[in-house]
Amino acid sequence: MIHKELENIRRNYKLKSLDTKDVDLNPFAQFNIWFEEMLKSNLIEPTAVILATASKQGKPSARTLLLKSYDETGFVFYSNYESKKGNELAENNNASLLFYWPELERQIRIEGKVEKVTQKESEKYFKTRPFKSKVVHGHQINQRLLTAG
């Protein structure tokens, strides 16, 4: 069934326009300005970002995850290396991030190559995880060990 009324749903965006004279030439500096603005707006899930990956056959896949940090070297998120996204990134490390902040009438798209953080950084992050998350992750590791032999 086609919903014809969807064609008529349209919102007028009036908060801000994107004018090149108002944008910092350094994309990381501009992202930081917008990110700080977003944090002040008290969004429900301020660090939510959509990660889009593709298999080596080019089949796309997208999911929402949480940004853990960013600086001029890149944007950091964590994932199980053996998850679908982990496997896709291992065979094709090209990906994109999409921040969508409808309350601010803004979205930011970032494209690039994904690389693993150091083992030390990964372990440091794992220690900050809630207990239940650590248990689930440990269970996944044990499952892999049991099925690997």
Annotate each language-model stretch with its function.
Residues M1-G149:
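Binding-site signature for planar aromatic cofactors or substrates
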